[in-house]
Structure formats: C-alpha cells, structure tokens
Curated annotation (Swiss-Prot):
The lineage of its organism: Bacteria, Pseudomonadati, Pseudomonadota, Gammaproteobacteria, Lysobacterales. This is Uncharacterized protein XF_1585/XF_1690. InterPro entries: Phage_TAC_9. Pfam families: Phage_TAC_9. It comes from the Bacteria.
C-alpha cells in the first residue's frame, strides 16, 4: 500500500493515509456479508473484486457495515486548501466540509474505498472466497 493517496477536486487536495490494517480488515469482514451471492467470476481477480465490492457498498449505503467503512475512509482523509491550510475529515468536520461540497462526497468515498481496501484483494482472492463462500456452478 502506498504511504498516501492524493487527488484533487476543484482546487482542494485530498490526502489519504493508510488506516490500521486490522481495523480495515475487521470492517471489510463485517461488510463481506453484503457480497454474498455476487458473481464469482467477477471476484476472480483483484480489479473485478474491487469493482464488485465498490458497487455493492454503494448499493447498500446506510447499512451499518457500510457506515463503518465510510467512517474509516473519512477519518484517514485530510484536506489541503489552495491557501495551504490542512485539516482532517474528523466526524465534527464532515458536515462543515461536505455541506458546501456535496459533489465531492461520493468521489472521496470511492477513492477511499479503493485505496484502503484494494490491497486486501491482491493475491488474497482464495482466502477472501473462503471468507465469503460463492455458489459453485453445480449449486446453481
């Protein structure tokens, strides 16, 4: 995992740093139940798995497991303004930040999910499929 992930939206630089691996893993496992019944072929490679996972999370916004992932992503995100001010997206800053930047919210969440969780899928798909059993062709 990279030490940080940076991207820019409308002049603001979002800087994401890695979450604690075990905290991220625990939240991913809790959200894993949402992936049951997903297309096993799509989960066969890291890129497909990350895309399926991201789409699934977005389709379950409001679920407690997804809310936990949102919190992890936002807590690990800082904003650098063009003036040089830096602040973290702590729970008490979320409303203030996104009330005037609603168009940023989903992009920040999607970038954060990819950054915080995609490395769990790389090289670990067999273990992930054991965690979330997918129906085999014989069972369908």
């Amino acid at each position: 995992m990279n030490n940080e992930h940076r991207f820019e939206i409308e002049g603001l630089t979002y800087v994401m740093t890695p979450a604690n691996a075990m905290a991220a893993w625990q939240s991913l496992k809790r959200a894993g139940v949402l992936l049951r019944g997903m297309d096993a072929d799509a989960l066969a490679n890291a890129q497909g798995a990350a895309s399926v996972a991201l789409g699934t999370l977005l389709s379950h916004l409001g679920d407690p497991a997804v809310t936990e992932i949102e919190a992890l992503v936002f807590e690990q995100t800082a904003i650098k303004t063009p003036e040089g001010t830096t602040y973290r997206l702590s729970p008490d800053r979320l409303n203030e930040h996104f009330n005037t930047r609603r168009t940023h919210l989903l992009r920040v969440l999607m970038e954060g999910v990819k950054y915080q969780y995609s490395d769990f899928f790389v090289g670990g798909m067999a273990a992930f499929q054991d965690l979330i059993p997918m129906p085999s062709a014989e069972q369908e």
